[in-house]
Design a protein with these regions (language model features):
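N-terminal beta1-alpha1-beta2 module of alpha/beta enzyme domains
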Residues: 1-82, 176-181
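An alpha-helical appendage that flanks or caps ligand/catalytic pockets
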Residues: 2-25, 132-176, 208-330, 359-385
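Hydrophobic faces of well-ordered beta-strands that scaffold small-molecule active sites
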Residues: 14-20, 59-61, 86-91, 116-120, ...
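Active-site mouth loops of central-metabolism enzymes
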Residues: 22, 26-42, 90-99, 174-188, ...
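Short, acidic/polar
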Residues: 36-51, 71, 101-104, 185-195, ...
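Conserved, mostly hydrophobic/aromatic
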Residues: 51, 55, 78, 108, ...
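Glycine-rich, proline-tolerant flexible connector loops at the mouths of alpha/beta enzymes
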Residues: 58-77, 207-211, 338-351
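Alpha-helix-loop-beta-strand connector modules within alpha/beta enzyme cores
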Residues: 69-89, 148-149, 225-227, 233, ...
């Protein structure tokens, strides 16, 4: 029995995703730049193809103003070089006019034939700082407009920021049906939780103790119930898996062995979400960790010394990592977004040791969003007018 009701209650499978380091976030030793691991198209697309080969069902393509890849351009480039893996595109609300964003995402969904998922984010733009309440109001309105564009014939919207009247939705019809691409969302403020509970599909969390994660899940679930909704829940976490726990712990220590604290701080500060509430919670993890950086027997916070955002890793043997994932699943977590350093090597480590022992799924398929044949949309099987 899960601790909260989840949308995919009937399935025992879990969506296991990897991470493509689009934002200058790949290292053999944290904080030590390696030009062979820069966020080039060649390197990042190889991570995607490797994840597909290893059986991962989705891959997060993040967004930030770093030397690297633009998210939506990168996802478009991945369409012809992949065939099975879903792509989870991080979209910072407000960067694009909402109706045009709906059309852009619909185009990508057609290119991927239903393999697009969307991570809604609300962080600041480069060189521009705005009030949190405004940013989440903007995201709330963008999400509502996306859902109108993907499910209705006409877009009519009157919000505090955006107003549209009688705009045809034909150009924005996606490949996926019954609601369009799934919306994944992470955030910790009351405005963020309210937005996710009312409009999104998967609530994403960064690593904390299981007790705190359970509290967060319950808080969001209560809000969703007020709208007669359920959600699925996801965990974004790094992972280090080896044959033995000792090997995994030794690798974790080696990963940060050349890290200068000043360099780590500068890496954290350059992220667009560096001052967010979620990042503050990750910093708190490091404050309460034991002398080796662990807040639970297999949850290590050392990664957060040189990374904004998700700042902890599961560390252990194959059996220990499997046990940790199973315990999260029993809580009600149905999506894992994993990563490790360097991303290509750790993708293969996890894939070869763990993936074959997991029952995995694609959440868009579980939700019935992906049609068996080309849908009757203006851009697919529908008649041209």
């Amino acid at each position: 029995m899960t601790i909260v009701r989840v949308t995919s209650q009937e399935t025992e499978a879990v969506e296991v995703s990897w991470f493509s380091a689009l934002c200058s976030d790949d290292y053999a030793h944290l904080g030590v730049p390696d030009s062979s691991l820069k966020s080039s198209w060649e390197h990042c697309s190889k991570i995607v193809k490797t994840a597909e080969q290893q059986g991962f069902r989705n891959i997060l393509c993040p967004s930030s103003y770093q030397v690297g890849q633009d998210t939506l351009s990168f996802v478009a480039g991945c369409a012809p070089i992949t065939s099975k893996i879903n792509l989870l595109a991080a979209v910072r609300c407000g960067e694009m006019q909402p109706i045009m964003l709906a059309r852009t995402l619909a185009t990508l969904d057609h290119m991927l034939e239903g393999r697009l998922t969307v991570n809604i984010i609300s962080s600041d733009f480069p060189g521009q700082i705005e009030d949190s309440a405004y940013r989440y109001q903007r995201s709330r309105e963008v999400v509502q407009i996306l859902k109108q564009a993907w499910t209705q014939d006409v877009i009519n919207f009157k919000g505090e920021i955006y107003q549209f009247e009688n705009v045809t939705a034909d150009p924005a019809k996606p490949y996926q049906q019954n609601g369009g691409p799934l919306l994944y969302f992470g955030g910790y403020s009351p405005s963020a939780l309210a937005l996710c509970a009312e409009f999104c599909d998967v609530y994403l969390m960064w690593p904390e103790t299981k007790e705190i994660l359970a509290q967060r899940m319950k808080s969001v679930s209560v809000l969703a119930e007020k709208h007669n909704r359920t959600l699925d829940y996801g965990l974004r976490v790094h992972v280090i898996v080896r044959e033995t726990e000792q090997e995994a712990r030794e690798y974790a220590e080696e990963l940060v062995s050349k890290l200068d604290d000043g360099k780590g701080s500068s890496i954290r500060d350059r992220a667009l979400d560096s001052t967010s509430l979620g990042v503050a919670h990750q910093a708190k993890n490091r404050d309460i960790a034991d002398g080796f950086g662990y807040i639970e027997p297999h949850l290590w916070t050392g990664v957060g010394r040189a990374r904004s955002g998700c700042g902890a890793a599961l560390v252990g043997s194959t059996d220990q990592i499997l046990s940790e994932l199973e315990s999260y699943q029993k809580m009600g977590i149905r999506a894992f977004i994993l990563s490790g350093y360097p991303h290509m090597d750790e993708c293969v480590h996890f894939g070869s040791k763990i993936m074959g022992q997991l029952e995995t799924c694609s959440l868009p398929h579980t939700y019935g969003r992906v049609p068996d044949t080309s849908p009757f949309t203006p851009l697919a099987a529908g008649e041209r007018t």
